[in-house]
A protein has these predicted regions:
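Hydrophobic alpha-helical signal peptides and transmembrane signal-/tail-anchor segments
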Residues: 1-7
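Short, positively charged
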Residues: 8-164, 170-409
Length: 409
């Protein structure tokens, strides 16, 4: 591939800034989801507009948000800004210093090639495709565009919190005339579906058994394994419920300081949300589906909390929608949530290579995408220490489940 790059270092600082990127850790391999993050940058610099999806749009016209610049972090204190000039050319600014200008046509050329390469993957010596692979034919372009890392770097915001935004985009808002900088997370429908909420020790939900089971029954349930020899969490949950014993929500794991951060975060969204999420988690094992929306419908039918639902049957759905949207826009189990969104939406690389933009200005479209495309997933029971009946200091028996949410596509 041949590209024309116009370098215009401001002698001292520009060269120094470029060297910082050249000396940064070079990421050689990545999976399809991570490669999609690099593709998103190049695709947006080619299109130079965002088109937020609005499901309520009936006239077919889409709001256009011109992109003025894109910011991408390589390390905690190393970032590049891709400024789009009036003629469409892109000026790359490294840590405050202009270092290179690249023609828009180069991004027009590279983006579709990168997309096709990501879809194909890279076959290994056995002829199959590894989950992580190299694409060395794009190395030169990556170096010249200050992209030593394939996956976007997540800044450390302190207090155990990572930035949810993969890219920051300065847009021209036609409505207000302002040029705000807005963060976006990136998801990809190429390759394995990504997670929305990752399992950690802090996502363990603890339940009290409504009645203690005999020791021999506890031993039998705790020893249940699946065909692969892993803990059979679904089988264990169903075995407990088959004893006419219910799992009553108790709490969520605290952090090392004894702080119930995730529990309090959920309560900030809605005081009943910890109970609702805990009930959904149990249903995800006792029912034959793991789809979030279907389980929420089932929970609404059961109505365990006893909401008045004669005139409004969306009590559970509305709260679950808020939960997944806040997770997508910034809430994490490890850091206090103040309902201040870090991200303004999601950029989804679809199977055609288009960038679907779900923006908070069309919140319902964003909520619909999340609510209709998520499922519960079982993380490693041995790694996160859940899935066994244990007796607490109070003599009651307890059982722990861990929550992880993954996109279905």
């Amino acid at each position: 591939m041949f590209f024309f790059f116009f370098f215009f270092f401001d002698e001292t600082n520009g060269k120094k800034s470029k060297r910082e990127f050249d000396n940064a850790k070079w990421q050689k391999k990545a999976n399809k989801g991570e490669w999609s993050e690099l593709y998103t940058l190049y695709k947006l610099l080619s299109e130079q507009n965002l088109y937020p999806i609005n499901i309520d749009n009936i006239n077919g016209q889409r709001l256009r948000m011109p992109i003025l610049s894109i910011l991408r972090h390589t390390e905690q204190y190393l970032k590049a800004e891709y400024k789009i000039e009036e003629d469409g050319q892109i000026v790359i600014n490294a840590n405050g210093h202009n270092i290179i200008q690249i023609a828009k046509s180069d991004f027009d050329n590279i983006a579709p090639k990168l997309f096709e390469a990501i879809k194909k993957g890279a076959p290994n010596e056995n002829g199959t495709s590894d989950s992580s692979f190299e694409l060395p034919e794009f190395d030169e372009f990556r170096r010249n565009t200050c992209c030593p890392n394939i996956k976007c770097y997540s800044k450390n915001l302190g207090k155990g919190e990572k930035d949810k935004s993969d890219l920051y985009i300065v847009i021209h808002d036609f409505v207000t005339g302002q040029t705000p900088i807005q963060g976006f997370s990136i998801k990809s429908e190429i390759g394995n579906p990504p997670t929305l909420l990752n399992a950690t020790d802090l996502t363990n939900f603890k339940y009290r058994l409504s009645d203690n089971l005999p020791d021999e029954k506890v031993a039998q349930i705790n020893s249940m394994v699946d065909k692969r020899g892993h803990a059979d969490i679904k089988g264990r949950v169903r075995a407990i419920l088959d004893q006419q014993v219910s799992l009553e929500f108790s709490t969520i794991n605290p952090n090392a300081k004894g702080e119930y951060v995730f529990l309090e975060n959920l309560m900030l969204v809605d005081s009943m949300l910890p109970q609702i999420v805990s009930d959904l988690l149990v249903l995800s094992y006792s029912e034959d589906t793991r789809v979030l929306s279907a389980l929420t419908d089932k929970l609404s039918e059961i109505n365990p909390i006893g909401f008045p639902m004669k005139t409004n049957k969306k009590q559970y759905e509305a709260k679950v929608r808020r939960f997944v949207t806040d997770i997508a826009l910034g809430m994490v189990p490890s850091a206090p949530w103040e309902a201040a969104h870090q991200a303004y939406g999601m950029l989804v690389v679809n199977t055609k290579g288009e960038i679907d933009c779900y923006h908070i200005i069309y919140r319902k479209s964003l909520e619909d995408y999340l609510y209709e495309n998520l499922k519960f997933e079982t993380p490693s029971a041995s790694r996160y220490g859940f899935g066994k009946i244990e007796t607490g200091p109070d003599g009651c028996q307890y059982f722990t489940l861990n929550i992880q949410l993954r996109f279905m596509k």
